[in-house]
Amino acid sequence: MAALWLLFCLSSSVLTTTTATPQPVSASVISRHDLFVQIDPERHALLAADRLTIEAIPGRPLRLSLAGTLHLDRLALSQSPTDDIGRDLPFQIEREATAPFGQYITVPAALVTAGAMTLTAHYHGVIDDPPKEPRHLRFVTPSETAGHIGAEGVYLSSETQWYLDLPESLSRYRLRVALPSGWTAVTQGQRRSSAPCPAELCREAGLTLAEWETAEVSEALTLVANRFVETSREWASSGGQSVRLATYLFPEDAGLADEYLDATARYLDAYISLLGPYPFESFAVVENFFASGLGMPSFTLLGSGVIKRHYVQPYALGHEIVHSWIGNSVFNRVDRGNWVEGLTTYLANYYWHEWSGDHAQARDQRHLMLRGYNLHVPPERDYPLGQFTRKQDERDNAIGYQKAAMVFHVLRQEVGEESFWRSLKTLVAQYRGRHADWHDVERIFAETAAKDLRWFFAQWIEGTGAPALTLKNVTAHPLPRDADGRFSLSGSIAQTGPVFRSPLPILVRMSNSRQHLVSTQLSGADTLFKSDLPFKPLTIELDPEAMVLRRLARGDIPPVLNHYVTDTKRSVILAFGGSDTDSHPFQDVVKRIRSQDAQKAPGQRTAITTLAENALLPGEGSVL
């Protein structure tokens, strides 16, 4: 094997260049990978062979990406499906100046033939990018790594570029992975076998060879490995679909397996009824050696810290399971925005509570999403939902997840219950194994509901913001000559910013502890409403159940620390007098605030006073 590998290394024709801004030139795609990888965790090393089936466009070069730390030893063109040796292909290596860790392997256009081409690539190298703490808040992003092979674990994803790839490829995969004894590999699809690696295939003795294969196409293949304890069960949904459920946990957490398997079964059963058949043969919960919460086709990769904290809530495990349909079966066309995270948040973080009958928690979740958008996205920092691609900070999270989820809630009210859920099943069925964007979502909902929804998507997806509302000219008086003592209520709702179309429920609290709901439809700068009431009205409130997306007045948001953090005007009032050098419980906090403010303009700094200096609270801004 070693001699044969040396022959591969010596037989290829290679030219290396550097390009400043290489442009994609190939419309060819890879339809299948047949991969063998041998992994040495102690040396961070990978040895690989990949047999690629390419649907090629003749006359155009193939430009395949590969990690810059991997060395391509040989590239060969197979003359037939049974040709395992093939004819050597010359190739050019381009290293991108703006991404020094990446490289492109280019096959000249003259060698690219029409139809299916089979290439075999042999390569080796090191993948060693240890996970680092995120640059942003932990709840927004996981630990950062492009990929890592080490004694603590293996993580190889699309960002690792651990196999040759072409843009826009949706591929099927067969993967054989050899690892030291005691290690278990997990990837997408089904594991077909696991046995000692034969000597003719593996360079070292004592390795275990596992074979995995995907039935569905995927945008990328993620491979993880560690010293797992595997627990599995066969499960059938209430509709009869069979799915293999599994956990791959570290030995100290193996006792949590049944809790995760039970929760997985509950979520799958619910979402199969809502979205249609589960698109894969199995689902696994896999423990990771660094902080993560990632959903891949047929498994989720959760950091050890959250595994230990029983991460089975709807916003946690439920969210990753919904991604099985939304994002991992129907793919997002990221260059045209990201609808996947908002819909997944709506179905998992919110709708699970409504579906299970916990209406109080559902209401709280709507308020949470609405307040999150208002807290983290002031009007001057807003941007259209259609421009969201991924979250990097709280603002992105509030727009791409929370606002988007509320938009789907408003869409559900616009098209009605039956059309909304039928649209989702249609979307999942029609775009299984395909990319979809916001325009595809619009088309599906419009056709299913038989409604023109162009205005809706132009307003909520392509536009910015949400309606800012004010009650005006509200009056109530007894109805004349009414023996039942009824009252007439009227008024108007002014939109103080851009004009939106939106439903708006108004709650009227009356005498005798009665309530009355007035349904209105915002359609202009001022919307009139009128209603006859059976009792005297006492108070009136706009949308107390948070059913629609809107800008909230400051008084409508309960005091929370996030409001202070995101406010542009901040004050700190100390209950203890004296200077920073005096001893008081918040001395270190005050010093840190002053230190952070030192780099800001005077008008942007936090005002710090004591109760003795200022007996009145500031008239504006947040107070701590």
Residue ranges and their predicted role:
Residues 560-624:
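Long, folded non-catalytic interaction modules
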Residues 119-228:
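Extended, low-hydrophobicity, Ser/Thr/Pro/Gly-biased non-transmembrane segments
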Residues 5-47, 73, 146, 167, ...:
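N-terminal, polar/Ser/Thr-rich
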Residues 63, 69-141, 199-205, 524-536:
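A surface-exposed beta-strand-loop module
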Residues 125-132, 544-557:
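Short acidic/polar inter-strand loop motif in beta-rich domains
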